[in-house]
Amino acid sequence: MFKTINKSITSILLFMISCYQKWFSPFFGPRCRFIPSCSSYGYEAITRHGPWKGGWLTLRRLSRCHPLTPCGCDPVPD
């Protein structure tokens, strides 16, 4: 049952990120200071690590994406 809940949460999160990438991101233009972009990072993190750890990694990444942080490459950890 827990596995089914994880899959459902993963699907919902990935759907939300995909909607953002398709419908909202084109209006805002490139804003992220990192490579890959925060939405791509979140999609990859949730796909690789599941909704809980991947979601936490995504939140940490989003908290670092601001003008006072230096730009650069920040891949999803293994």
Curated annotation (Swiss-Prot):
GO terms for cellular component: plasma membrane. It is found in: Cell inner membrane. Pfam families: YidD (PF01809). InterPro entries: Membr_insert_effic_factor_YidD (IPR002696). Its main location: membrane. It is a peripheral membrane protein. Could be involved in insertion of integral membrane proteins into the membrane. This is Putative membrane protein insertion efficiency factor.
